[in-house]
A protein has these predicted regions:
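Short, Lys/Arg-rich flexible segments
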Residues: 1-76, 98-138
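Short, surface-exposed beta-strand/loop "edge" segments at domain boundaries and coil↔beta transitions
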Residues: 74-78, 83-96
Length: 138
């Protein structure tokens, strides 16, 4: 096998490993950061009196509602909260604000950007990627 073929094979294996680690180790870090941001930016904003929040049992902070995908071409991880209420994405409503059924307006409570900033500043995502790749032999 030529050096070029060896390098191409290595790069293909590395790309596959990066995608795997992003979908497992790094996405777990991202989900934890999102969960914390939901508690700090959304749940701490007010205590509802008309309804009970589902929180970690099917609510916005439930990691089971967070779907991770990887764009292989750009090596980009995206974690999206897929929780919906009456056909509307709850995260989108919370991020942008919405009108309640009683007519009251709920202000925007952005949490994605704070989660991303905190996660990147902590170095946890980078550490998870490095550790995951080492565990796969890279």
């Amino acid at each position: 096998m030529s050096i070029e073929a060896d390098v191409n094979l290595f790069m293909k294996q590395l790309d596959t490993a990066i995608s795997k680690v992003l979908l497992t180790d790094v996405s777990e870090v991202a989900k934890n950061a999102l969960r914390e941001a939901v508690y700090e930016e959304v749940y701490a904003a007010y205590t509802p009196t008309v309804y009970e929040r589902q929180m970690d049992s099917g609510g916005l902070s439930d990691k089971e509602n967070m779907m991770a995908t990887v764009d292989v071409a750009t090596r980009t991880l995206e974690v999206e909260d897929i929780r919906s209420d009456e056909g509307a994405n709850v995260a989108t409503k919370v991020e942008g604000g919405y009108r309640m059924p009683n007519g009251a307006m709920m202000g925007a409570r952005p949490f994605h950007k704070p989660a991303e900033e905190k996660m990147m500043a902590s170095g946890e995502a980078e550490s998870a990627l490095e550790s995951g790749l080492k565990n796969l032999g890279f």
